[in-house]
From Swiss-Prot:
Its cofactor is NAD(+). It holds the Pfam family Epimerase. This is Bifunctional protein GAL10. Its EC number is 5.1.3.2, 5.1.3.3.
Amino acid sequence: MSDDIFLVTGGAGYIGSHTVIELINHGIKVVIADNLSNSSYDAVARIEFIVKQHVSHFIKVDIRNEKELNQVFSNHKISGVIHFAALKAVGESTKIPLEYYDNNVSGTIALLNVCKSNNVKTIVFSSSATVYGDVTRFGDNSMIPIPEHCPME
């Protein structure tokens, strides 16, 4: 078993909670950070039921709050981050784009600042295929997989 401790942001969300289960099942120590705006503490209870052990480190925190996030890093000696924390509803994002920008972009920047100040150099960033747009609009498979020269919409 490794002494590394991974922070999973958005760890109470769907993908985050499944990732936490796999990490725990592989003997990796995990700290879950989630502001519960898109999820529920019930997910942590389900994780505990599945892995048959108590999840000792769940922290309700907004990743935009660098002071609180720094405290998480120093209290738990975080060695790597798997970053899932984000607002994700595409339709809603077109109605309130600044809130999405603040949460998703500013939150990621704050997280990266905290990683840097704590000398954490391992981060896995997750996003959505929707950021690439619809490449099927070209009417053939010339843009699948998406090449770097693919035109932006």
